[in-house]
């Protein structure tokens, strides 16, 4: 029950007609244009950071409802097609707007987190997610706190799952992050702190010790 109220709450940022469309899609997906629904969700995710982190739950509910109602996957197919388009244009998006780029990464990672096939993450999303995270680990992105913050947040959410899908790529990603932390001189103090925290987080088996948690939490809030 808690989930449905959260979904309703997240839909409030849309106009009333779109809210109605989404509410219907959540309950009766066969009666609405699911291509339009997927476009609406992606469009909003690219401009609304809070929604981009929560949209996976709504997409998951619609996918489940459609499978149950018609045994179909129209919504998922349209969603993944649109994600593929946005993914291909990611560098242009990043140049145009850091905020839109960060929203795109959050959204792709959120879909990876929520949309499962037989309780496993979708293999088709593993490399796109890694590609986004590798882009955030490049030296020009590590200078930007907004991008570092996004990178660390995604690794907190899905790092463990992602590593299980491809440990070699995770090792390569963390080699980049370690080099950035040790060798890059133009990091902000907050960027450096966030990188140190995520390095420790993975080293601890994707969790922080109580002591480390208290330390980082106090540093971030100060």
UniProtKB/Swiss-Prot annotation:
InterPro entries: ARM-type_fold, MIF4G-like_typ-3, mRNA_TranslReg/HistoneTransl. Interacts with eif4g1, eif4g2 and slbp; probably tethered by SLBP to the 3'-end of mRNAs ending with the histone stem-loop, it also interacts with eif4g1 which is bound to their 5'-end. This is MIF4G domain-containing protein B. The keyword Nucleus applies. Functions in replication-dependent translation of histone mRNAs which differ from other eukaryotic mRNAs in that they do not end with a poly-A tail but a stem-loop. May participate in circularizing those mRNAs specifically enhancing their translation. GO terms for biological process: cap-dependent translational initiation; regulation of translational initiation. The gene is mif4gdb. Belongs to the MIF4GD family. Gene3D superfamilies: 1.25.40.180. One of its GO terms (molecular function) is RNA binding.
């Amino acid at each position: 029950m808690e989930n449905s109220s959260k979904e309703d709450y997240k839909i409030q940022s849309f106009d009333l007609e779109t809210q109605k469309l989404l509410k219907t899609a959540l309950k009766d997906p066969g009666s609405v244009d699911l291509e339009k629904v997927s476009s609406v969700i992606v469009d909003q995710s690219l401009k609304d950071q809070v929604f981009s982190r929560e949209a996976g739950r709504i997409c998951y509910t619609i996918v489940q409802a459609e499978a149950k109602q018609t045994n179909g996957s129209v919504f998922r197919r349209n969603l993944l097609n649109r994600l593929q388009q946005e993914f291909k244009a990611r560098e242009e998006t990043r140049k145009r707007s850091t905020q839109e780029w960060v929203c795109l990464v959050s959204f792709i990672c959120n879909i990876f987190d929520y949309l499962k096939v037989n309780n496993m993450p979708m293999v088709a999303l593993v490399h796109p997610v890694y590609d986004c995270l590798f882009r955030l680990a490049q030296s020009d992105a590590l200078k930007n706190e907004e991008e570092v913050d996004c990178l660390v947040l995604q690794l907190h959410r899905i790092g463990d799952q992602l590593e299980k899908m491809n440990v070699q790529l995770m090792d390569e990603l963390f080699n980049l992050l370690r080099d950035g932390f040790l060798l890059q001189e133009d990091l902000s103090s907050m960027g450096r702190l966030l990188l140190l925290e995520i390095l420790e987080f993975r080293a601890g088996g994707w969790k922080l010790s109580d002591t480390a948690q208290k330390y980082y939490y106090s540093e971030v809030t100060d």
